[in-house]
Structures are given as structure tokens and as C-alpha cells.
Swiss-Prot record:
Protein purpose: Part of the ABC transporter complex CysAWTP (TC 3.A.1.6.1) involved in sulfate/thiosulfate import. This protein specifically binds thiosulfate and is involved in its transmembrane transport.
The name this protein goes by in its record: Thiosulfate-binding protein
GO cellular component, one term: outer membrane-bounded periplasmic space
Superkingdom to which the source organism belongs: Bacteria
Location in the cell: Periplasm
Signal peptide: 1-25
Matches recorded under CDD domains: PBP2_CysP
Source species of the chain: Salmonella typhimurium (strain LT2 / SGSC1412 / ATCC 700720)
PROSITE patterns on file: PROK_SULFATE_BIND_1, PROK_SULFATE_BIND_2
GO terms for biological process, alphabetical: sulfate transmembrane transport; sulfur compound metabolic process
InterPro entries: Sulphate/thiosulphate-bd_CS (IPR000957), Sulphate/thiosulphate_BS (IPR034408), Thiosulph/SO4-bd (IPR005669)
């Protein structure tokens, strides 16, 4: 019986080196929210260097995908093979379990602080000299004030804005729901443009010149102030505010299929390291490391934070009550059009 000698021919040295080089190269895709580009552009290179150092020179490349976090989660459910998610809303991570079983039910317990390596709150960006004299949420319902923030239907950023405004009004009105709804109707009526994501809202305010106040994460408004320094924007942090957590997770089914589980876990754990936490505060995000926050105290004004769960119940309840079709948001928008 003839033997096909070609099948038994050993690989050449060049071929073996090529295969070895391919085996050592790892690529991660980080699916993130719309306004995190600059943060991860700063975080990724030092981790890539640390990975090479810890893994015998193996090369790791981290690629980024950015959009509104809800749109990002939907893209993964539709087939985007992201290895890790770094979002600004718990529900946008949870849906990867609920709708796709891509992560386990207990994903939030796998990393510290409910898998949230950093957090933020809401800030107001006003034009030079604060011409509309904006200081707190109550100033945002005046008839002469025009607001810019994304659509809460598509943006986690905007959902926090909506809930922060509702919570502040609820506190001010002593829990009178009718008064809070009246406040929220005018608040939403004052929105000049609803963009789909936070970065679009930034462009509308800073480049198109629309609106008197841009509402976004404290981190985002501070970075915009620096980016557009010539325009003299000013940042206002209201007295009552919301705790906005930024949950992260490796996408189990994807990392197993991609062979990237080790790198994905190492990457997200590294976000809690002193090096990463320090970089994070440079971009005006708050962290749960008191030593690092103490060194950056001048960046972060004191504000009274409330948790979504304390004021509104669980996130599934929040989504059903406020943001589902026919929910409170839709009712308030309809009332504002009358």
C-alpha cells in the first residue's frame, strides 16, 4: 500500500516559528460605552506592556468598540464576539445573561465592588461665565434653559441623568409623586436635542453650539472642559446626585471560543490595581480606593449620592417602570408635548 510521504513530512523551522508566533499573539475586543474612548486609550497600553512582561514577551493587543451601552449589548447578542464588556449600566451587562446566556447569573460577584472598578455621578457643563446661573437640578426646569443629553432609551448615561433628576426632585418635594412628575415633564420638555449616545450629545453642545447645559457623567463633562478649553466651559456638580456604577465582565462564551479567557480575566482584574486606579482618576472617574481618592480630593466636589436601588428598586423594576414602552418616560414626554 502506497504511503503519502507528504503527510508525514515534518514542518520546516520557519513554519514552526510562524505557528509559535501566532500562538503567542492574543487579541481582546473590549465593548464599551460611548464616552470611554480616551479612558481606555490611556489604560490599554500599560496593561499590554504588563501582559508581555508577565507572559514571556507574548503580545497582547486590545481593540475597542464604542457606542451607547445598550446598543453595544445588543450587538453582542447579535453576534459581536467581544471578549470583555465595560459598560455604564448594570442592565446592559445583565442582558447578556438574560437574553443570551453568554455570562453566568452571578457575574457581578466575580470582581470587587459589584464588578465596578470605578464610578461616577452626573455633572452639568455650562457655557463660559455660567450665563444662565445654573447651580442645581431645580435650575434646569426654568423656561429659559435648554438642555442637551442623550436619549434614555438608547443611552445608559441618559438613564442615570433621568433618574438623578427624578431622585433630586423627589427629595425636594418630600416624596410627592405628582410634583415630581410635574418637574420631570418640564425637565424633559427643556431638552433641545436627544442624541443616541453621550458623544453625540457632546458634539451637539460643544461644536454645534446648541443648549445651555450639557448633562453627562462628571468624568465626561470635565474632560470636555479640558478638550474645549478655549470655549471656557464650566462644570457644576449638583448637591444631590446619583451613584453611577460602571460594571465590567468577561463574556464567558466568547472568551472560551476565542481562547482569550486568561487575558480577559487578567485585564479586568488589573483595572483594580493602583496603577490603573490612578489613571482612572486622571480622567475624573471616582474609585473606591481611599488612598488614591485622597490624593485627588481637589478634583471631586462633595455631593450626596444615592443608589438607584435605594430610590427606585432593582434595575429590572426601573427598566420596566420608567424606560419600557409606555412607561413613565413615554408618559412624561407625551405630557410635555400637550
Amino acid at each position: 500500500m502506497a504511503v503519502n510521504l507528504l503527510k508525514k513530512r515534518p514542518l520546516t523551522l520557519a513554519a514552526m516559528l510562524l505557528l509559535a508566533g501566532q500562538a503567542q499573539a492574543t487579541e481582546l475586543l473590549n465593548s464599551s460605552y460611548d464616552v470611554s474612548r480616551e479612558l481606555f486609550a490611556a489604560l490599554n497600553p500599560p496593561f499590554e506592556q504588563q501582559w508581555a512582561k508577565d507572559n514571556g514577551g507574548d503580545k497582547l493587543t486590545i481593540k475597542q468598540s464604542h457606542a451607547g451601552s445598550s446598543k453595544q449589548a445588543l450587538a453582542i447578542l447579535q453576534g459581536l464576539k467581544a471578549d470583555v464588556v465595560t459598560y455604564n449600566q448594570v442592565t446592559d451587562v445583565q442582558i447578556l445573561h438574560d437574553k443570551g446566556k453568554l455570562i453566568p447569573a452571578d457575574w457581578q460577584s466575580r470582581l470587587p465592588n459589584n464588578s465596578s472598578p470605578f464610578y461616577s455621578t452626573m455633572g452639568f457643563l455650562v457655557r463660559k461665565g455660567n450665563p444662565k446661573n445654573i447651580h442645581d437640578w431645580s435650575d434646569l426646569v426654568r423656561s429659559d434653559v435648554k438642555l442637551i443629553f442623550p436619549n434614555p432609551k438608547t443611552s445608559g448615561n441618559a438613564r442615570y441623568t433621568y433618574l438623578a433628576a427624578w431622585g433630586a426632585a423627589d427629595n425636594a418635594d418630600g416624596g410627592d409623586k405628582a410634583k415630581t412628575e410635574q418637574f420631570m415633564t418640564q425637565f424633559l420638555k427643556n431638552v433641545e436635542v436627544f442624541d443616541t449616545g453621550g458623544r453625540g450629545a457632546t458634539t451637539t453642545f460643544a461644536e454645534r453650539g446648541l443648549g445651555d447645559v450639557l448633562i453627562s457623567f462628571e468624568s465626561e463633562v470635565n474632560n470636555i472642559r479640558k478638550q474645549y478649553e478655549a470655549q471656557g466651559f464650566e462644570v457644576v456638580i449638583p448637591k444631590t446626585n446619583i451613584l453611577a456604577e460602571f460594571p465590567v465582565a468577561w463574556v464567558d462564551k466568547n472568551v472560551q471560543a476565542n481562547g482569550t479567557e486568561k487575558a480577559a480575566k487578567a485585564y479586568l482584574n488589573w483595572l483594580y490595581s493602583p496603577q490603573a486606579q490612578t489613571i482612572i482618576t486622571h480622567y475624573y472617574y471616582r474609585v473606591n480606593n481611599p488612598e488614591i481618592m485622597g490624593k485627588q480630593a481637589d478634583k471631586f466636589p462633595q455631593t450626596e449620592l444615592f443608589r438607584v436601588e435605594e430610590k427606585f428598586g432593582s434595575w429590572p423594576e426601573v427598566m420596566k417602570t420608567h424606560f419600557a414602552s409606555g412607561g413613565e418616560l413615554d408618559k412624561l414626554l407625551a405630557a410635555g408635548r400637550k
